[in-house]
């Protein structure tokens, strides 16, 4: 898998995974996704603020400027760390217990004649996210309490 496609897959996974509180107990995705979304929104402002602050208060200090540049780069790279983790996670095969749970939800969706994602060998976390998204739209709130 190409390096940049991991980031793209991470963004797709971020947009697909349902933000259900019950899932946050089982999977770390909810916390990672909240942090990544927050970083995508606010870290560019932190980067600009770091450089502007340095330019206002220490205009001629090259050491302060280099520290501000490093701070800005660090702030801009934080969202990429989250997207990279999500991209790797999306392509990881499900653990045994999660795979059983995946097939159980697929059976419930088949009973309602809902189209399911194509799974070649072992289902991945991206497949689970797609199935959970469909389950979120098709099943009532009681479904999440059964989990």
From Swiss-Prot:
UniProt-listed InterPro entries: UPF0208
Keywords: Cell inner membrane, Cell membrane, Membrane, Transmembrane, Transmembrane helix
Membrane topology summary: Multi-pass membrane protein
Spans traversing the lipid bilayer: 38-58, 67-87
Location in or out of the cell: Cell inner membrane
Pfam families membership: DUF412
Protein name: UPF0208 membrane protein CGSHiEE_06015
Organism: Haemophilus influenzae (strain PittEE)
């Amino acid at each position: 898998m190409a390096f940049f496609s991991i980031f793209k897959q991470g963004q797709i996974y971020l947009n697909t995974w349902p933000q259900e509180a019950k899932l946050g107990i089982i999977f770390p995705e909810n916390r990672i996704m909240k942090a990544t979304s927050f970083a995508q929104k606010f870290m560019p402002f932190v980067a600009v603020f770091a450089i502007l602050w340095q330019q206002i208060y220490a205009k001629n200090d090259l050491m302060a400027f280099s520290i501000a540049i490093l701070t800005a780069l660090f702030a801009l790279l934080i969202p990429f760390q989250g997207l990279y983790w999500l991209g790797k996670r999306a392509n990881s095969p499900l653990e045994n217990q999660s795979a059983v749970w995946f097939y159980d939800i697929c059976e419930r969706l088949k009973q309602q004649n809902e189209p399911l994602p194509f799974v070649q060998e072992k289902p991945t976390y991206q497949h689970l996210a797609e199935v959970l998204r469909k389950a979120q739209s098709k099943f009532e709130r009681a479904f999440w309490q059964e989990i």
